[in-house]
Amino acid sequence: MAKKKATKKTAKTEAIEVIFSFDTTGSMYPCLTQVRRNVGNMVKKLFKQIPNIRIGIIAHGDYCDEGDPYVITMLDLTDDEKEITNFVKNVDSTFGGDAPECYELVLYEARGFSWSSGKSKVLVMIGDDIPHTASYAGNTKNLDWFRWLHGFHSVYFS
C-alpha cells in the first residue's frame, strides 16, 4: 500500500482589529499597574502571532472625571507597536468616585474608530463595574449600552 505524502496546510489567519478598553478609576489602579508593566510584551506577541492586526486603545474614567483629567481618551486603530505601548504606559489615572462607570460611552466611542471593512471587530473591556443606565444624569447622550454592542464580532468583559 502506497503511503500518502503529507502536505503542509497553510493556516488561514483571520483579518482582525482589536480595541482594548480599560477602566482607569481608583479601584482599577492595581490592574492598571499590571497593564502598564506588561503591555510591551503583550503587543509584541499579538503582532507576531496575528499578521496585519491593528490595535486601538480606550482608557476611561467616569463622567465625574470630566476635565480632571478626562472621561475618556483614545488611540485609534494602528499597527504601530511603539505608539500603542507608549499610549498605555503614559495614560493618566482617573478618580471615578462612584459606581457604575461609563462603559456605555466606551461602546459608543468604539464605533467611531477607523475600522476596516471585511475585518472582524473585537472589543476587550477591562473593568470592575457595570455601565450606567441611559437615564443616568451624567450620561447626557442617554446611551443604552446594550444597543452599542451590535456590530462587533466579539465583545469581552473582564
Regions found by a protein language model. Name each.
Residues 1-158:
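Divalent cation-coordinating acidic motifs and surrounding scaffolds
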